[in-house]
């Protein structure tokens, strides 16, 4: 299955312009040079800083990942440098009592001046890599405040199913003696059918990452 371009309709000339000027690079983590990591770290730090300095802090010192390290990335470039980014990592999660192989998606960011470059465009670029990884599902988590936004961009186009009423248990990215080693969050789940239909997604009200989020 491939995602046709009409699943991401343009809302105006501004969005068309943003899409046409961005050049996408799909790369494995081992292909990135030190300069790539430094550039991505600066981009992600600026992208996540508006949501709080705590969220931007992991990207200090040239580190281009926050928790678990990604396996493959889709990076959009334009004349100003990095314009957009999304990453994926294969891992087993436990959905209820079922162990399930997924490609976790995360580290999504778009430069503020390119608001027309939607997450659906990033997924079109990432999709061939997810097929190559041989996973049944793509998996991501987002805050409840983004539900309407993501339903408009992904759900209505059929790119993903948004699942609510699920708690996600993860390990902290860094061990601290003054905090529990795991945390449980009430999040929205994004499920992208890749090699299997959505009907094969297991039922369950808690998901164990058994590791840090991407």
Curated annotation (Swiss-Prot):
Stored Pfam families: NodA (PF02474)
CC annotations in GO: cytosol
Compartments it resides in: Cytoplasm
Disulfide topology: none
Entry EC number(s): 2.3.1.-
Keywords: Acyltransferase, Cytoplasm, Nodulation, Transferase
Keyword hit for Amino-acid biosynthesis: no
Root EC class: transferase
Superkingdom of the organism of origin: Bacteria
Similarity comment: Belongs to the NodA family.
Name recorded for this polypeptide: Nodulation protein A
Upper taxonomic lineage: Bacteria, Pseudomonadati, Pseudomonadota, Alphaproteobacteria, Hyphomicrobiales
């Amino acid at each position: 299955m491939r995602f046709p371009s009409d699943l991401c309709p343009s809302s105006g000339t501004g969005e068309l312009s943003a899409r046409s000027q961005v050049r996408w690079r799909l790369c494995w983590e081992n292909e990135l040079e030190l300069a790539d990591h430094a550039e991505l770290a600066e981009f992600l730090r600026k992208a996540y800083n508006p949501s709080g300095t705590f969220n931007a802090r992991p990207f200090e010192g040239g580190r281009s990942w926050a928790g678990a390290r990604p396996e493959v990335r889709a990076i959009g470039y334009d004349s100003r440098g990095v314009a957009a980014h999304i990453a994926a990592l294969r891992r087993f999660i436990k959905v209820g009592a079922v162990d399930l192989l997924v490609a976790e998606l995360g580290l999504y960011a778009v430069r503020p001046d390119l608001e027309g470059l939607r997450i659906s465009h990033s997924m079109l670029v990432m999709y061939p890599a997810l097929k190559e990884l041989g996973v049944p599902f793509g998996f991501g988590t987002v805050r409840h405040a983004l539900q309407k936004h993501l339903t408009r961009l992904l759900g209505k186009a059929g790119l993903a199913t948004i699942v609510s009423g699920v708690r996600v248990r993860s390990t902290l990215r860094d061990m601290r003696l003054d905090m529990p080693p795991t945390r449980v969050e009430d999040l929205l789940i994004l499920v992208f059918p890749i090699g299997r239909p959505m009907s094969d997604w297991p039922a369950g009200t808690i998901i164990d990452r058994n590791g840090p989020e991407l």
